[in-house]
């Protein structure tokens, strides 16, 4: 459990509670999960990169898998420079968000998308992709 998916009283927020929040409040709860993922990737820190992933996604993103991805994109594109929020999508069983993402060695604009779900009593990243 992390501070960003908790109510002010310290208890974990459910997906239904998150869905009741305003877009700004919802972003404030979910953006830190993306911060962890991106900073973990930039620093090649597997534990930080996957700390907010579901078990399913952790099985896919192994230390070796992350190392290979980082080696490839950092050589070609650099590291993450900044992101701009684009959209938020509320679903019955998940929340999806998209951002425009920029890298330090590229002028291209990339799309970062992530899907958040409730698993094991906390909000986690179930899917994420950069393209």
In which residue ranges do the predicted regions lie?
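Short, low-complexity N-terminal intrinsically disordered segments enriched in polar/charged residues
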Residues: 1-43
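Short solvent-exposed beta->alpha transition segments
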Residues: 31-32, 47-87
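Internal amphipathic alpha-helical segments of the cytochrome P450 catalytic fold
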Residues: 46-47, 122
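Surface-exposed, charged secondary-structure patches
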Residues: 68-118, 122, 127-131
């Amino acid at each position: 459990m992390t501070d960003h998916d908790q109510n002010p009283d310290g208890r974990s927020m459910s997906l239904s509670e998150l869905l009741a929040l305003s877009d700004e409040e919802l972003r404030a709860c979910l953006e830190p999960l993306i911060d962890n993922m991106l900073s973990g990737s930039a620093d090649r820190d597997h534990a930080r990169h996957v700390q907010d992933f579901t078990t399913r996604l952790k099985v896919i993103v192994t230390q070796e898998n992350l190392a290979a991805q980082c080696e490839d994109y950092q050589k070609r594109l650099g590291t993450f420079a900044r992101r701009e929020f684009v959209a938020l999508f509320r679903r019955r069983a998940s929340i999806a968000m998209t951002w425009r993402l920029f890298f330090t060695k590229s002028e291209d604009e990339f799309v970062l998308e992530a899907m958040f779900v409730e698993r094991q009593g906390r909000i986690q990243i179930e899917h994420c992709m950069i393209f």
